[in-house]
A protein has these predicted regions:
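Acidic/histidine-rich catalytic neighborhood of metal-dependent amide-processing enzymes
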Residues: 1-61, 106-107, 184-187, 191, ...
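Phosphate/diphosphate-binding glycine-rich loops and adjacent basic-rich segments that engage nucleotide
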Residues: 29-78, 83, 87, 165-171, ...
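A residue-level signal for beta-strand positions that form part of recognition/binding surfaces
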Residues: 2, 31, 51, 67-69, ...
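Metal-dependent amide/peptide-bond hydrolase catalytic core
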Residues: 92-208
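Residues that cap or initiate secondary-structure elements
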Residues: 11, 38, 60-62, 76, ...
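Alpha-helical metal-binding/catalytic segments enriched in His/Glu/Asp
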Residues: 1-12, 68-74, 79-102, 124-129, ...
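Flexible loop/turn segments at secondary-structure boundaries
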Residues: 12-15, 40-42, 78, 113-117, ...
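Generic alpha-helical propensity signal that fires on short helical segments
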Residues: 21-25, 49-52, 88-90, 96, ...
Length: 208
């Protein structure tokens, strides 16, 4: 039978090329995927991905308290498709957990730059009326159950400046801590194969 070759672009940022592909002229019924990244290897496969954007509308109010810049950096990171099952921490999830339960109000929070990359760093500007906030954050961060892969993780807390804070901070942190992340299901047919996974890849605080 005739051999048809299909080339697409922008796979890493959302399979944009495949989504725009006109398949009406293709006759083949068997797909050989040569995107295995190893020369001489062909893969018969069926996979897909989807990007979900969660938006929390926020109201900005005047700052009450002292502003701090807090974050976590130095995580291993990796490709969320290839390395999601290697026990690597997601910086966005780690920072949200470190802030949960503290007397704090968010001014901004951001981490990650690509949908398919496990975030290595995440940072927030927060406001707290607690005089010992730096110590409270350090104590909460010390409780973070980081996997053994994160030997170089570093938490930090330093004075900052801020003009406004987010009235919905508690809801934002609750959402970040509740969002599932990582491996959700493994294949029942192929040992060690991830069937479904999630990655909280990009976190931003945008202007209205």
């Amino acid at each position: 039978p005739p051999l048809e070759a299909v080339f697409t672009v922008d796979e890493d940022i959302g399979m944009l090329g495949a989504a725009a592909l006109d398949m009406s002229g293709l006759q083949g019924r068997v797909l050989l995927n040569i995107d295995s990244e190893d020369e001489g290897i062909l893969t018969v496969s069926c996979a897909g991905g989807a990007t979900s954007c969660l938006t929390v509308p926020v109201k900005r109010v005047p700052v009450q308290g002292n502003a701090w810049r807090v974050g976590v950096r130095g995580l291993t990171g990796g490709h969320s498709g290839v390395e999601i099952n290697k026990g690597r921490a997601n910086a966005n999830k780690v920072l949200a957990a470190a802030l949960q339960g503290l007397p704090v109000t968010l001014c901004s929070i951001a981490g990650g730059s690509k949908d398919n990359a496990i975030p290595r760093a995440s940072e927030a500007v927060v406001v707290s009326e607690a005089d010992d906030f730096a110590a409270l954050f350090a104590a909460n961060a010390a409780k973070a159950a980081l996997p053994e892969t994160e030997q170089h993780a570093e938490f930090y807390c330093e004075p900052a400046e801020a003009g406004e804070m987010l009235a919905e901070s508690e809801a934002v942190l609750d959402l970040l801590n509740a969002v599932p992340n990582g491996v959700q299901a493994m294949s029942s047919d192929i040992p060690g194969l991830v069937q479904t996974s999630l990655n909280l890849g990009i976190l931003t605080t945008d202007a209205d």
